[in-house]
Amino acid sequence: GHTSRPHLTTDLVYALGTVITQMPALLTRKLDPRAAAVMVWGAVQSGEAANAIPREGVLRGTLRLMDRRSWDAAEGMVRDLITQLLAPLDARFELDYRRGVPPVMNEAVSTELMRTAAQRALCANAVRDAEQSTGAEDFAVFLDRVPGSLARLGVWDGIIPRVDLHSSQFVADERAVAAGVRLMTHTMLAALHH
């Protein structure tokens, strides 16, 4: 279509913009707020000319959730919301929803075993609660099948500037390897005696 006659075609760029701007907000109204839904768009592609309305477009993004129930329901919810958003715009879509790993759900007994083992292996003030991350973690697949607990091992030496894990400037203090071995050994022994 031509931009001088948008009423004669489906304005695909407008449709993509509608999904981009409305989907994240609508998900927060459909999902339990404790799921902490984080939808972020990483790529949008459609058309090249300023005066032509393209026929096709691609939108790519990620949806991260903090609880399993919401993670299980998300695909159907995303499909339904896109359908509702695009219906008045007369736009069709194909959804290629690829589930990543589920959210990490630590089991309480395993978590307490590891916490106690860490206090013994390292020291009492070396153990801190960490905020749940929206990053994908493959260990979640194991926790789906077997009770367990995921912990983060601090690897900052306290001297060099602290940077994000994914930064090109990230340097792990290799002394953390020995601390990790002590932690896992104490955790394993505690589990055997539990």
Regions inferred by a protein language model and the residue ranges of each:
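Soluble non-cytosolic domains of exported or imported proteins
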Residues: T10, A108, R175-A178
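Short, small-residue-rich loop/turn micro-motifs
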Residues: G57, L63, L153-I159
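Midchain, well-structured core segments that form catalytic/ion-binding scaffolds
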Residues: G1-N106, S133-G135, A140
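Structural motif
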Residues: E56, V146-G148, S167
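Short, low-order "capping/linker" segments at domain edges
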Residues: V104-A121
